[in-house]
Structures are given as C-alpha cells and as structure tokens.
Amino acid sequence: MAKLYYYYGAMGSSKSATLLMSAHTYERQGKKVLLFTSSVDDRFGTGVIASRVGIDKDAEIIGRNDNVVELIGDTTGISCIFVDECQFLTGEQVMQLSDIVDNDNVPVICYGLKTDFKGELFEGSEALFELADSFNEIKTTCSMCESKATMNLRTNNGKPVKTGNVIQIGDDEYFPMCRKHYKKSFL
C-alpha cells in the first residue's frame, strides 16, 4: 500500500540533495518517477530541483492555483512522485497528493521546511503533518553550536529579522539554528 511521506528539516539540511539521490535510486532500478517543485522557489531557475552541493534535475512546476491531480494526470507506470519545496503547497494541494496515494496507489514523497523564519508552520507543512502517513526529520546542526537545528533564522544586512513577508527574495540570508540560539539572536 502506497503512503504519503513528509521529509522535513531546517535550512541547509540537504533536503533537496536527499530527494535527488532517492529519485536517482528509483531511476537506476529502471523505475519511472515524476519530480515536482513549487513555482515559488526559483532560486536556481524555474522548474529545477537543485542542491547546494551542485546536483540538480529538471522538474515540473506546481503553481499556487494548480490542481495537482489534473497536473499529474495518468499515473500508470509511475513508481513514485517526488515533491520538493512542499511547504509552499496549499492545504488543498496536499489533500490532492493524498488522493493520488489513496486512489492510484502511488507513493508520494514530499521534502520541505517545517517552519518559516518566524517559527510558524507553512500551510503546506501543516497540511502534511495532518495528512502524511510517515514523517521523517532530516537533521542538521545549528550555525552557532553543535545542537540540532530546528529553526530558520533570517538576516538582512547581518541583522536578525522576525517580521515581513514569509517569502523573501533579495539580500536576506537564512541560517539553521537551535531554538536557544534562535531566541538569543533577538535579545
């Protein structure tokens, strides 16, 4: 029986690299996979899943208004569907992914952030915690210590930012942080 999987972690935890390696394993075994990413993430170009370690692969784009079931279409012969940057999906789109799992018996493996720079769940993350069959944390360490990073610190011109739009393109940088150092950043 297929499942809906959610792999989540802080910034820099190799989520995209893990997705690409998993998809490669399927393909090396002769299995057909579909790769998707959110239209919101265009850091490496549109329709590309890319890792900071230098590996990338083309992917289909899921727009905010897309019906995922219609976008994917016929799943005959598909062994697995991979979705990167799933935190940017809507709750309805996550529900549609669960429909594919339940109705077509095709596993869907989603990768993304758990929370934004404010420490709040993204809409897609929240829906995945409600609907996924399996949750797996991809761990990384805090930028300031050796503790596990669970938060994402946004900085602008080297100063911590806790307000503003959730999706920010420009001069902002993000750092994986443990809760203790995340909170200390604002003191």
Regions found by a protein language model. Name each.
Residues 1-72, 116-127, 140, 168-187:
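Conserved P-loop
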Residues 6, 80-82, 109:
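Structural motif
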Residues 60-82, 91-94:
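Conserved RecA-like ASCE ATPase "motif II neighborhood" in helicase/translocase motors
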Residues 84-86, 112-113:
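Walker B catalytic acidic pair
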Residues 86-97, 117-122:
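Conserved ATPase-coupling elements of RecA-like P-loop NTPase cores
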Residues 101-123:
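Sensor-1/coupling segment of RecA-like P-loop NTPase cores
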Residues 132:
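Short basic (Lys/Arg) and small-residue
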Residues 141-167:
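Short recognition patches in nucleic-acid-associated and regulatory proteins
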